[in-house]
A protein has these predicted regions:
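A small/polar active-site loop signature that marks catalytic segments
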Residues: 263, 272-425
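Beta-lactamase-like hydrolase cores
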Residues: 79-148, 218-228
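C-terminal region of N-terminal signal peptides and the immediate post-cleavage residues
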Residues: 53-96, 173, 515
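Active-site SXXK
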Residues: 138, 152-170, 267, 294-295, ...
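Mid-domain, small-residue-enriched loop/turn segments at the edges of structured enzyme/sensor domains
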Residues: 127, 185-214, 222-265, 272, ...
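Small-residue-rich helix-loop
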Residues: 143, 360-515
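Short, well-structured active-site flanking segments
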Residues: 167-182, 306-314, 423-426
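Terminal targeting segments of Actinobacterial cell-envelope proteins
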Residues: 1-41, 65-87
Length: 515
């Protein structure tokens, strides 16, 4: 079985992989607070950097928030608010690392427990488990059945992110290539794991559409013209990188029909969506062939000026073994950037592709079984016990997944402050409460607004499952990691999501040092 390098991924050296590069993102306008609600947001939010040696913890600004002082009546200064919790006026492009104080007081477990037990209650049936840990020391601050296996929903993507960053590498890019075929007028579109292709020109500043089929077709047409090919040109597709069933039998047919996922292939347009802006609705059931046919259409258009035509239709074939003649290629955004997108949008299709690419990088089969084995192995290599963990998929759609809140808290701790600095690349992907991703429309009422901008966490939702795992800096400047998971819940009960958000908010606003 070909490894990821042979599949066309451009892989970096270990030294390159272990030195993450922070890139500023385009600033977003600050979101207005709900009427009558004052939000306390951090000075620095959008990238948290934990230095491995000299500075145990730090908050990176890339970009960050700058906020004014808060004043009470008649100009009287209000109680002092830590700088990371001040109200923002705008996003800043500044890039610095502001270290957190490693001597900041650790919350008292009894105080944390008292607060969370009052908040973490189900709305109707079911129950919650939860774990809170001090990120620097690993000290447990809260544990409600933390070792109990749970259906985690999309919190599973945290494990997949770890596996992708470790096994594939943060700076790796996936290559989609056009190869010379068995005859001069036959070409082969070779899939290399990029499922975020766009159908237009490549967009170097983008993640979705970073590599474009129009650019690939234009470059391929020029190469064919330079070789004197007159056509008609036959397009074949080699998508044999992945093996096993493309559709996981553990997934509900209703979820597949609704477009929550689709059969998994190593090439797709728009993460197997019908258009770049689509986030719901049915997906193509053969994303690889859909992408190949779109490429053939672009090649037909490019060939008109290059003096050749394209045979209608695309058939599957295998690329020739040995040295391959590459006519053209385009590369994806980096794995770190794709992980960011996966976590922010909770992209099931991209998560499943990452699992298979991680498996190939580890010398396993690019299948669902290979993916689940690779993800479990990478988590175990972090020193996290996986004896009772069971993975049925790597996106979190399967009800057969069994992972504990403690395992998720430990994974978040590994990302924020563990020794493997490659995992820091996942930090920017955690949605920010009230601002970005799947938390963008939450934390807007009076009971959760003080967590807005402070809580960064991966969400997870299935019919009777809800989960939230992430990190937060409390009022004393202590970095905490947490995981809350509810199972057997009453479907549609609004109070369950609120219970999670209030619990995370309590951590953000809790000094909890007994003073």
């Amino acid at each position: 079985m070909k490894g990821v390098d042979e599949a066309g991924a451009e892989k970096q050296t270990p030294e390159q992989q272990e030195t993450p590069v922070l890139r500023p993102r385009k600033p977003r306008p600050a979101k207005p607070a709900s009427k009558g609600v004052v939000r306390f947001l951090p000075l620095v939010l959008l990238t948290l950097v934990i230095a491995a040696l000299a500075v145990p913890m730090g908050l990176g600004v890339a970009p960050g928030f700058f906020g004014p002082s808060l004043f009470g009546v008649a100009g009287t200064p209000a109680p002092k608010v830590p700088p990371w919790q001040q109200v923002p006026k705008q996003l800043s492009r500044t890039q610095i690392v502001a270290p957190l104080d490693a001597s900041a007081p650790v919350p008292l477990p009894a105080d944390v427990t008292n607060q969370l037990n009052a908040l973490l209650t189900p709305d109707g049936g079911g129950d919650f488990t939860g774990v809170v840990e001090d990120a620097l020391t690993g000290l447990p601050l809260y544990d409600r059945d933390g070792a109990k296996n749970r259906v985690p929903a999309s919190n599973m993507k945290l494990l997949t992110a770890v596996a992708a960053l470790r096994a594939i590498g943060p700076e790796t890019r996936f290559s989609t290539r056009v190869l010379a075929g068995p005859s001069a007028s036959t070409i082969i579109l070779s899939a290399g794991g990029d499922v975020l292709l766009g159908d237009g020109p490549s967009q170097p500043s983008g993640v979705l559409g970073h590599a474009g089929l129009e650019t690939l077709a234009s470059d391929a047409a020029k190469a064919l013209q330079d070789r004197g090919v007159k056509g008609p040109v036959t397009v074949q597709l080699d998508d044999g990188l992945f093996t096993g069933p493309a559709l996981n039998p553990a997934w509900s047919p209703d979820d597949v029909a609704a477009g929550e996922t689709a059969p998994i292939f190593p090439i797709a347009l728009n993460s197997a969506r019908t258009s770049p802006g689509a986030t719901t609705g049915p997906r193509p059931q053969d994303a690889a062939l859909t992408a190949a046919e779109a490429f053939a259409g672009k090649l037909q258009a490019a060939g008109a000026s290059a003096g050749f035509t394209v045979v209608p239709g695309v058939e599957r074939a295998s690329a020739p073994a040995g040295k391959q003649d590459v006519l053209a290629s385009v590369v994806s955004a980096t794995v770190r950037e794709q992980v960011d997108l996966m976590l922010q949008t909770s992209d099931n299709y991209l998560a499943e592709v990452f699992g298979r690419m991680a498996a190939l990088s580890a010398g396993k089969q690019g299948s669902n079984d290979g993916a689940t084995a690779a993800v479990s192995a990478q988590v175990a290599e972090l020193g996290i016990a996986t004896d009772f963990m069971h993975l049925a998929d790597v996106s979190g759609l399967a009800l057969g997944n069994q992972v504990s809140a403690r395992q998720f808290a430990d994974v978040v701790r590994a990302i924020t402050s563990g020794p493997d600095t490659r995992l820091r690349a996942a930090l920017a992907g955690f949605p920010v409460a009230g601002l970005t991703g799947t938390l963008g429309d939450r934390y807007g009422d009076a009971s959760t607004s003080q967590g807005a901008g402070l809580v960064r966490a991966k969400t997870g939702t299935l019919n009777s499952v809800i989960a939230l795992s992430g990190y937060v800096v409390d009022t004393n400047g202590r970095l905490l990691v947490f995981s809350f998971i509810g199972n057997g819940l009453t479907p549609g009960a609004a109070g369950n999501k609120v219970a999670l958000d209030r619990s995370a908010t309590a951590l953000a606003s809790c000094g909890c040092t007994g003073g």
